[in-house]
Amino acid sequence: NKSLKERATIIQRRLIADDRGWFLKAITGTEEGIPTHTGEVYLTMGKFGQAKGGHYHPEAVEWFTIIEGSAILKLEDMETHERLDIEMSLVKAITVFIPNNVAHVVVNNGDKDFILLAYTDKLYDPKDTITYEIKG
């Protein structure tokens, strides 16, 4: 039998940071022992007064949950251009499902940084992330 030290795995992750905040993938979908069909679990932080996102995915769907701070999730359907703003915070304790072809941006509307926990059903593909600015 293998020891716990041999069976447990510590995986170094890459923290990506810029003026708006930071981004960290917790599960990339390529880990040993992960099911063959998976997506990605990630955390992202948005600094006070900043927005994160501003894109849509033709293929992937996502689920967003704020785990610290508060934000407005702005959505726009790329086919109908219907728009929806959703207030999110730890106090509200909601998870929002974002269908494919729906543009999304998360705008910090609080007095401190927000942290968002997200899941996407696909592995990251830059061809499936189309920049789009939701106006207003």
Where are these regions (language model features)?
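Non-catalytic, conserved peripheral segments adjacent to functional cores
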Residues: 1-95, 111-136
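Conserved SET/PR-domain catalytic core that frames the SAM/AdoMet-binding pocket
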Residues: 93-103
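Asparagine-centered strand-capping/turn motif at beta-strand->loop junctions
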Residues: 106-109
